[in-house]
């Protein structure tokens, strides 16, 4: 029975943990860096077995409830990747509480806004996070305080005390229903202040099924998830997570020797990394002999990185680049061999192929419109080959942002189905099209399109044309002026080691490249930039809004 007396069907991402603990009690669920060996590499001597993860998260769930953090309570979690992070997350799911996750590396003013918007009743964090909460007045609504580590002047209890208080309480699992709120996950904020995406339990369960089926993930595998929240899926899939020795907020600066050491020592069979991290491994150039499945998401993966990573993997391994967003993941996916085959088209201005839609998602392309669309009856669906906004409806499609009504109206469309039911369609905020083979192509963010007097230009149909120059690391198309009359400007970041004095020659070559394609022939302004701003989560999404402001300030 649910809290209101109605019968409910249990739906909870933690529901599979007790079964896995019975089936494979001694299998390592989480392996963390821990101390250092004589060679300076992490010892990875801090582990949790499935039995330990299940039993200890039971105790913590019971203890949290005793301290007022139970069903429906929103709890900010600011804990570094560690055994405590995973114990807490599964304990909160078991308790029916609602963890709130925000990227700690975002602008501090934006971070405060996110935490205040979430209106949490509890704040769980390491001492540094608790100190910042006190000094910066984060989350003033939080009255239940749990410190992971030593507790000082800020009150509350320690996680160790919580676990002791819940010890012996037995199995814990709230009878959450599919539509109950499971978590609030904030977006990366690459297009503004991060938004809190409301995840219901059915969204998490749906993601597990889509990931298992799309990528054939089998229990017993060993995963190296370089984005910690993704590691939460591993215990539900029966995998071992090896938490890498790196700063997850700065994947572009990860030490490839440390990553390779972990993958070799523990026989890592699965790897997830942002395009920035994949470039680190690609440039390191050491084979990855045990990896059978590599995935990369967060931004389009440059074709040269795809080719290099594929060369480091075994011949029968697969390198997938899923397409999606915090609001809906995965939407589509493409394997490296297919991506390689579309490289020529991408570098000629076709956009980036993101592959076939992951079933049972339904993806449709609609006419570009910057206004809110309340009802699906008000949209115009485009035919194959026409560029428009990408929309998706499916089991992982979230339906609202927390305390962001305007953002919800702009991103969600209500659709009445033929059977009389209603569903939510998510507007991805991306533009793209379907080709004749039913593959989805990504052309860039809707807000990043440049509206010139002769028509729109889309970033992913422009930048790859210029990125082929050997002295160019990456480019970014921005618009200067009023939409409809914007001047397209190409910002250029040179490869490391290329002198600024070489830019005049590079610019001449880029002009010739642009002139060879009708849609880029009108780009007449090229600006060298020392280093593009990128998102904090994946270090891969270019901050084009900031670049556009910068470009407008440069002398003609």
From Swiss-Prot:
InterPro entries: AMP-binding_CS (IPR020845), AMP-dep_synth/lig_dom (IPR000873), ANL_N_sf (IPR042099), ATP-dep_AMP-bd_enzyme (IPR050237), OlefBLtnSyn (IPR054888). Its EC number is 6.1.3.1. It comes from the Bacteria. One of its GO terms (molecular function) is medium-chain fatty acid-CoA ligase activity. GO terms for cellular component: cytoplasm. It is found in: Cytoplasm. Pfam families: AMP-binding. It catalyses: a (2R,3S)-2-alkyl-3-hydroxyalkanoate + ATP = a cis-3-alkyl-4-alkyloxetan-2-one + AMP + diphosphate. Keywords: ATP-binding, Cytoplasm, Ligase, Nucleotide-binding. Signal peptide: none annotated. ATP binds at residues 187-195, 321-326, 430, 445. The keyword ATP-binding applies. GO terms for biological process: fatty acid metabolic process. The keyword Nucleotide-binding applies. Belongs to the ATP-dependent AMP-binding enzyme family. Involved in olefin biosynthesis. Catalyzes the conversion of 2-alkyl-3-hydroxyalkanoic acids to beta-lactones in the presence of ATP. Monomer. Forms a complex with OleB and OleD. This is Olefin beta-lactone synthetase.
